Amino acid sequence: RDRYICIPKSEKNLKSGTVTIGVSETALHLFLLPKLEKFHKLYPHIKLKISNHSTPQAIKALRKGFVDFSIVTTPLYCEHPLQSQRLCSFRDILIGGPSYRDIGFSPKRLRDLQDFPFISLNEGTATRNFYEKYFYQNQLVFSPDMETATTNQILSLVQHDLGIGFCPEALAKDYLDRGEIIEIPVKEHSNPRDICLLTDSTRPIGIAGKKLLEILMDSEG
């Protein structure tokens, strides 16, 4: 009687399969990596295909069916049949290199920082859109002197005293702790930003994808 063990079909399917994910750089580093580590330990045979996108690109990839789901940062705009669900929040700070240490002792108004060279992500990214709106709300124009493709590049450029820029606090922490960069407090506080999961309600997600979604939605995992 014990010779034949019934293995649920869902468990069989998890011996193989592929999950495709569109993810922005910030969402990858601040949220997704530890979740993927847990998923890979539980289901080592599942292949993961990860595409690095800006938020608008990730929305487009999901709409076209190139990915099973996307994980992105706000601000974002998605229409039916796409659905958005908040996963966590994060906070950006303004950072500068060693030569900017003198301006880091007290909060500064954005207007007083306009003459310093700003480093920013390229146009068409959620981060760039966020700061263009943030400056506009404070009657200013955000016109960076240097544009990069990734947040890590912003960190490197700031570290080498090429300007100041906004960066997620969690990504800057190690650099701050080592004294390689400094935080420049700003009087006009910016709102926290969210990392969100985007799915397409018209497209079914496979068993492996659903298992990964369970891990993504687990606040303790």
Q: Where would I find each of the regions flagged by the language model?
A:
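Alpha-helical linker/hinge and terminal dimerization helices associated
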Residues: 1-12
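Well-formed, non-transmembrane alpha-helical positions, independent of function
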Residues: 3, 38, 60-61, 86, ...
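Short, well-ordered beta-strand segments
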Residues: 18-22, 70, 95, 119, ...
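Secondary-structure junction motif
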Residues: 102-103, 117-138, 205-209, 213
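Acidic, Gly/Pro-rich loop/turn segments at junctions of secondary structure
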Residues: 42, 53-116, 123, 190-191
